[in-house]
Amino acid sequence: MSDQEFDLSKIRNIGIMAHIDAGKTTTTERILYYAGRTHKIGEVHEGGATMDWMEQEQERGITITSAATTVFWLDCKINIIDTPGHVDFTIEVERSLRVLDGAVAVFDAVSGVEPQSETVWRQANKYGVPRIAFVNKMDRMGADYFAAVESMKEKLGANAVAVHCPIGSESQFVGMVDLISQKALYFLDETLGAKWEEREIPEELKEKCAELRYALLEELATIDESNEAFMEKVLEDPDSITEDEIHAVMRKGVIENKINPVLCGTAFKNKGVQQLLNVIVKWLPSPKDRGTIHGISLKNNAEISLEPRKDGPLAALAFKIMTDPYVGRITFIRIYSGTLKKGSAILNSTKDKKERISRLLEMHANERTDRDEFTVGDIGACVGLKFSVTGDTLCDENQEIVLERIEIPEPVIDMAIEPKSKGDREKLAQALNALSEEDPTFRVTSNEETGQTIISGMGELHLDILRDRMIREFKVEANVGKPQVSYKETITKNGASETKYVKQSGGRGQYAHVCLEIEPNEPGKGNEVVSKIVGGVIPKEYIPAVIKGVEEGLNSGVLAGYGLVDVKVNIVFGSYHEVDSSEMAFKICGSMAVKEACRKAAPIILEPIMKIAVITPEDHLGDVIGDLNRRRGKILGQESSRGMAQVNAEVPLSEMFGYTTSLRSLTSGRATSTMEPAFFAKVPQKIQEEIVKK
């Protein structure tokens, strides 16, 4: 596609999100097929899906990274991001939602809302992303569209409303009644679902469809009370309401996040996908509808507002980094204002560093097309950025706006890693550096005492796949240790320290003197280091060295060497020596001072707590709950339907290694579980003592 101008109102930036195995990638594949982007349908279970382009994805049949692509439908340009449904890859969902204007949530018609669907929905709530829903797999045994709609209301608190009525069910599912147009749509199998026939509503469904349509109209009237004419028509003459009127009210309700219309179909059997494409265009917002962009000025911390205009100042967000063996480092960006041209010099305002764009690329999974410019509303990729990482703002050199960052969760699991041979040491370091740039939830640290390299991530599958990538993409063979819990340390009261670092050994000595005050920061806020030095007691040029020393000191705690979190440090006083003071001396002194202060501030160890959902046959419920209690679990609640029970609990990660295997033997292989990091909590005293002893 050439760089043709696209009216902003005709762009849709959408994500496809769901629980693992609800059929997200298959739905995206069908969208690409019907919109003419691919000529052959790729199947996930055959390992041929276009959007699952990494080898690991094709082998495992799951989506790991958010693949991006662009399609055209009904005169609109739709940028689609297909996100992973596995909890270990939550950051991919989080960073996609941050840059999207709307989303399609895909649900399994048999299971309805599953635990990971709740996580993704919560993330979308956080960023206020308007959503429509697609109940997929209507051809499966036990499929129930209306039960899925109800489960969205109950479990997600969504204002879910049916806009379809299925015709037939399970293997007899042949189409649906569109409650807005009041037409029955029958799909023709011989055209792979590309064509369908519109017929009258079947006699046996007429009464039900009339009730459903009235319920839909009533709901629309309720969410837009300012539209009195529409409300009057609903009450007095609902049959006189036109399709256009319904679409207008629905669009407004979706954009304002007041309603979540629910469609049905089966992507695998090619039914209902074009209807989904139609409403993506009709109901989901364009960048124009999302309105003003807010950010903070670097100069004075005041709030800045920008309108989404092509001729406005540039404001873009880097939301993903990818390393390509041929092109190098690729940065995915979303442009909120202005235009970005190939070859232009820009500012990374988050880091206050200048960057230059060498190439602009439009992406289709892992294929790419060169572009001369991207403009407001575009999602694309650029080559040449050296400093930018996930969550950084890119802007004009004179603009200096910083947009809201992407929230990055703390890793919960650690593994030691070492190269198989000495020759691989440098390659391993490069691979780890590239992978941690791509994925902010993957951290690489060194254990000072043992000299081991430790990798940390969101779960065993996460680290497993990254290890796979090291072997395949970076050709590095590495040995890894057993997974360990990623504990953290923090403080529980205020503390202070006065530290002098003095060395005299002939010639020039070393001198630094630093006074610190520390206090607990609010949970989840991270560490903050602030200089309150006045009157030049520590010269200005040494302050960054003190801050760096403090930050390095916080990397390993005082109880068991785990990183300190949620600590606020104020550098309040100190002194220096005209000759003997140096940056190195102040850095060492800063590190010693913060450690000393932490020892006086009642330090504790924190452990990751996981939120777990177990779905089990009711006759095994007692065993499952008993087992979770033995693992220091806290049962949050349970619910039952159709002979199956779901137990929700919070359990320390340290108790959950090998849980899948023991759950299998406990329930004869009939139960399933999903787990995700919830928060960090204080370790019981007895366990803390054991950890410190180790």
From Swiss-Prot:
It is found in: Cytoplasm. Residues 9-288 form the tr-type G domain. Pfam families: EFG_C, EFG_III, EFG_IV, GTP_EFTU, GTP_EFTU_D2. InterPro entries: EFG_II (IPR041095), EFG_III (IPR009022), EFG_III/V (IPR035647), EFG_IV (IPR047872), EFG_V (IPR035649), EFG_V-like (IPR000640), EFTu-like_2 (IPR004161), G_TR_CS (IPR031157). GTP binds at residues 18-25, 82-86, 136-139. Signal peptide: none annotated. Keywords: Cytoplasm, Elongation factor, GTP-binding, Nucleotide-binding, Protein biosynthesis. GO terms for biological process: ribosome disassembly. SMART domains: EFG_C (SM00838), EFG_IV (SM00889). Belongs to the TRAFAC class translation factor GTPase superfamily. Classic translation factor GTPase family. EF-G/EF-2 subfamily. HAMAP family: EF_G_EF_2_B (MF_00054_B). Catalyzes the GTP-dependent ribosomal translocation step during translation elongation. During this step, the ribosome changes from the pre-translocational (PRE) to the post-translocational (POST) state as the newly formed A-site-bound peptidyl-tRNA and P-site-bound deacylated tRNA move to the P and E sites, respectively. Catalyzes the coordinated movement of the two tRNA molecules, the mRNA and conformational changes in the ribosome. NCBIfam families: EF-G, PRK12740.1-5, small_GTP. This is Elongation factor G.
